[in-house]
Amino acid sequence: MRDIHHFIGGASFTGASERFSDVFNPNTGEVQARVQLATTGEVDRAVQAAQAAFEGWSSTNPQRRARVMFEFKRLVEANMNELAELLSSEHGKVIADSKG
């Protein structure tokens, strides 16, 4: 069974907690993965990373932000099937729902 760990500040890592929550397949009800639960320190780390990212992003001029967002949109569209598979796996959604 696959374990899903954390992604904070641009890096994935295995957290310190030994606690996990099951992710269920919505079609069968079976457990398809486990997501690691964060410690208080890891939540604080995620909040700090988000605050640091916001500082840089909020000071970026609107034209640059628009270019970044359009490139993000292009990448999402180009990788829609793979992203839908990942989202379905991580959240227990059916593929059609993951695609929106």
Each language-model region and where it sits:
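Terminal low-complexity tails and localization/encapsulation signals of metabolic enzymes
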Residues: M1-R34, R67, E71
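Glycine-rich loop-to-alpha-helix module at the N-terminal edge of alpha/beta enzyme cores
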Residues: Q32-G100
